Amino acid sequence: MGEEDTKVIVEPTANGTSSLQKTSDAISGKEVQENASGKEVQESKKEEDTGLEKMEIDDEGKQHEGESETGDKEVEVTEEEKKDVGEDKEQPEADKMDEDTDDKNLKADDGVSGVATEEDAVMKESVESADNKDAENPEGEQEKESKEEKLEGGKANGNEEGDTEEKLVGGDKGDDVDEAEKVENVDEDDKEEALKEKNEAELAEEEETNKGEEVKEANKEDDVEADTKVAEPEVEDKKTESKDENEDKEEEKEDEKEESMDDKEDEKEESNDDDKEDEKEESNDDKEDKKEDIKKSNKRGKGKTEKTRGKTKSDEEKKDIEPKTPFFSDRPVRERKSVERLVAVVDKDSSREFHVEKGKGTPLKDIPNVAYKVSRKKSDEVFKQLHTILFGGKRVKATQLKAHILRFSGYKWQGDEEKAKLKVKEKFEKINKEKLLEFCDLFDISVAKATTKKEDIVTKLVEFLEKPHATTDVLVNEKEKGVKRKRTPKKSSPAAGSSSSKRSAKSQKKTEEATRTNKKSVAHSDDESEEEKEDDEEEEKEQEVEEEEEENENGIPDKSEDEAPQLSESEENVESEEESEEETKKKKRGSRTSSDKKESAGKSRSKKTAVPTKSSPPKKATQKRSAGKRKKSDDDSDTSPKASSKRKKTEKPAKEQAAAPLKSVSKEKPVIGKRGGKGKDKNKEPSDEELKTAIIDILKGVDFNTATFTDILKRLDAKFNISLASKKSSIKRMIQDELTKLADEAEDEEGEEEDAEHEEEEEKEKAKGSGGGEEVKA
């Protein structure tokens, strides 16, 4: 009987499987398997206890009806568990885990389930016998109901005992089979006694617990059956939720990794592609990926409870609300508004913007006289006033005034011409007459300063500025040059000798002009007859007056009219230029001419009476200058007694030479008079050989300290009674050749003398020679 009572509850269900097996179907994972095995052991113990109690009730005849009712209720519980398991079959992962657990449970429960199947028939027979006794014992029914309530309460409290059951799982697995064997071997009598004692204690405890449970059940909306249904799936749901959450976290991590990889790829694509269309396509792809992820998460979370679903939804909503902030966002970025800032506009230079409009006339820079006068003028006030009249009150730098004025080519009237002309006239009328005359001079407008009125000047200026043009063909440059030529002094030969050094600089600049005038004078010399003679007489008078004035200044008495030889203007200009050329050549010779001067001085002393020399006054002036120079050079160089004795020797012959020409003045007068009377007659010109012989004779008796090229020409003219101005160039060459010959001879003689003299004396003589050269140049 004991074996039959323990096997009553392990009744097969409608599907042919035990109820113990079906409760584990809803549990997934190793933990669920362990909990299920622990529960089965406890239930088996409780069923054994209830079996003993039922044996006592069988004696009374009413116990089997309660057991049948409990069996029906267990069947209902198993059916409900099947439904829950059917819902969970949708999850492939949970099913796999359940299959693994089922295999393990089958291995552990083979002995128990096998015993249960063999004894099902015995249980049915005992139930039928018990049904007959239930009608006789109504009190037993009440006891059965109370026991059933206890069992249900025990099942409800199964969750509370779950923690303790988990601890006992490891040790209970192996003990299940042993306990089943012990139950079979225990005597029925011993079991009945032990069960009675236990049942009495348990009944008292169960009554107390049932009272508290009944109060709880009253407050609940559903029955105890609903509570049992909810309690078990809640535990299962919590476990599944924890697993699902872990799985979701892992999946989210993987998704985040994938998203990070995708973001990196997207960043590379964005760096390469800046177009908005690509950005939009990428954003659409990202949205589709998010939707797919949401769908997958929804599929995964179908087995989850409403709480987990609410959590996931809230998390997803937060993710949607909180925008991502990667380095390069996938979404299209709005265009930034450009910031408008106030910037101070810098005005460009007015000089760069200044523009001169073209007029009807020619630009002032193309009119030569106007351009020349504007360039020579230096007063800025005149140009400022002109600039305001021509271009208005525009500010311009002082350096650019002339440039703008020279670019002016006439007024370009805008609007009414008459009004514009009136404005210009008003501007001119405000200016003084003197300034207006300056404007006329600038623009080369001829105006009579005394007679013309201010109004007439203004009208002329306005007419000219309307259409500028050249008023005259004569150039101002050439006029000024001609005036400068006329201003050069017309002096006689002695005056030219004294002032040749002053005119040397000016004469060098005008060598080209002089050669031109020389050619013209030579060409026209044959054609000129009486007119030239009359001009010569007038010029001679003027020259005589100038000579007298110069002589009075130098302290020399006046001379008669016959003393001064006279030449034309062209000849004098040519002579002065040739003198300057001779002086430059004599400077190059230097020491050569010094020796010649000494020899020629000795020769001239012996031949004073034979050859007539130059007039006395210029000689005295030059001698005084040379004496002064010699004194200065001697004082600077040496103060020895030898030098002083030599100076005295050299000064004595100079004084004698100065006295000799004074005596010969009376002798020269008839010669010059004859030349003046005969010069008008045309005689044959001498040949070159005759000229050479005459030049040699003249050079032998000439004092090189005072003589000049004009003096030699005058002597040649006096000798041949002809003006030799046409042959100046040939005469000049002859004189130069003779001078070089004399210089060479003098050098040879000096070389012989230098051997005899000491080196100190040679240096002094060279110093004297250099002083003599300077005198000749002067």
From Swiss-Prot:
Its main location: nucleus. Residues 191-300, 526-587, 732-766 form a coiled coil. One of its GO terms (cellular component) is mitochondrion. Residues 621-631 have a biased composition (Basic residues). Residues 40-95, 121-153, 165-185, 209-243, 287-296, 303-323, 678-689, 764-778 have a biased composition (Basic and acidic residues). Disulfide bonds: none annotated. Residues 491-502 have a biased composition (Low complexity). GO terms for molecular function: DNA binding. Keywords: Chromatin regulator, Coiled coil, DNA-binding, Nucleus, Transcription, Transcription regulation. It is found in: Nucleus; Nucleus, Nucleolus. A motif (Nuclear localization signal 1) lies at residues 289-296. Residues 703-717, 732-736 bind DNA. A motif (Nuclear localization signal 2) lies at residues 489-496. A motif (Nuclear localization signal 3) lies at residues 618-625. PROSITE patterns: DEK_C (PS51998). Gene3D superfamilies: Homeodomain-like (1.10.10.60). One of its GO terms (biological process) is chromatin organization. Residues 244-286, 527-553, 560-582, 745-763 have a biased composition (Acidic residues). Residues 685-740 form the DEK-C domain. Pfam families: DEK_C (PF08766). InterPro entries: DEK, DEK_C. Residues 14-26 have a biased composition (Polar residues). Interacts with DEK3. This is DEK domain-containing chromatin-associated protein 4. It comes from Arabidopsis thaliana.
